[in-house]
């Protein structure tokens, strides 16, 4: 067996909240064989298996009585290309932002709006990550996953993944599919998405009237760096709450009481609200309780100022959820996976 299994390992370096909890067992899988070895070890020793990537979408509420398997596989390859587009495959353990930059350097467009999102390639399809008008589903071509129930490999095409807003089939079958590698359909011609005002405004400020995908990436990196704290400096998991979808009637009621409410009508008649606006209006922006708090510049982001426990962060999140229900009648859903 090439898999190196360690005991009693701190997970602080492996979650972006910087929560200091221990894993009963810990290993890193660099290839498919080591993934299978981890599954066999889990079964043989009757210990649960928790698979993580960059730990950027994870809230650990206590010590983990499991084998924590960190996906550490690396590799980027073009599997098919012509003069118009290319299919690029990346291993699950590839860090997301460097992968985006690698594709741009290859002259391939499509991922630039997803620049500087933390995490790994393998985790990206699980919640259909998105930003500034682009989601994974818009550039997704396929993925290879291991069925933990049968040990067999399965190929997923776009229609198999049931992608939705921060949602996919993988979130609805937790613990079954272990994503090994993902393929993206990228273009050699720029088809830029500049619908979001801040992106266009930043490009205008830079005096760029004919932006390239690189320009869009740089603009978005600058915007995200200003809005979101660096997890290496201040522990966080990015946006902690999803933007809620509400009925048009509830939106009208809220708007009558709060004319400044931010809402985006959806094709199905619902309205997507800005969770950050709701949290800020409720007075939580900049709130701090010990080392657990809400970021002073971005209400959507919960932060660990140093030694907050996962339970303290979770309790803060639940207090915010309860307050938003009481004030607006809106339920906020947490984005990070809780363990």
UniProtKB/Swiss-Prot annotation:
* Organism for this UniProt entry: Pseudomonas syringae pv. tomato (strain ATCC BAA-871 / DC3000)
Q: What InterPro entries does this protein's entry cite?
A: FAD-bd_PCMH (IPR016166), FAD-bd_PCMH-like_sf (IPR036318), FAD-bd_PCMH_sub1 (IPR016167), FAD-bd_PCMH_sub2 (IPR016169), MurB (IPR003170), MurB_C (IPR011601), MurB_C_sf (IPR036635), Oxid_FAD_bind_N (IPR006094)
**Protein role:** Cell wall formation.
Q: PANTHER family recorded for this chain? A: UDP-N-ACETYLENOLPYRUVOYLGLUCOSAMINE REDUCTASE
The biological process GO terms on file are: cell division; cell wall organization; peptidoglycan biosynthetic process; regulation of cell shape
Question: What is the official name of this protein in its record?
Answer: UDP-N-acetylenolpyruvoylglucosamine reductase
Q: Which cofactor does it need?
A: FAD
**Gene3D superfamilies, alphabetically?**
3.30.465.10, UDP-N-acetylenolpyruvoylglucosamine reductase, C-terminal domain, Uridine Diphospho-n-acetylenolpyruvylglucosamine Reductase, domain 2
Where the record annotates domain FAD-binding PCMH-type, the positions are 19-189
EC code: 1.3.1.98
Q: In which pathway does it act?
A: Cell wall biogenesis; peptidoglycan biosynthesis
Q: Where is the active site?
A: 166, 239, 335
GO terms for MF: FAD binding; UDP-N-acetylmuramate dehydrogenase activity
Q: Indicate the family of this protein.
A: Belongs to the MurB family.
Give the UniProt subcellular location, in the record's own words.
Cytoplasm
Which reaction does this chain catalyze?
A: UDP-N-acetyl-alpha-D-muramate + NADP(+) = UDP-N-acetyl-3-O-(1-carboxyvinyl)-alpha-D-glucosamine + NADPH + H(+)
| Span of the signal peptide | none
Q: What Gene Ontology terms describe where this protein resides (cellular component)?
A: cytosol
Q: Which UniProt keywords apply?
A: Cell cycle, Cell division, Cell shape, Cell wall biogenesis/degradation, Cytoplasm, FAD, Flavoprotein, NADP, Oxidoreductase, Peptidoglycan synthesis
Name of the gene this protein is made from: murB
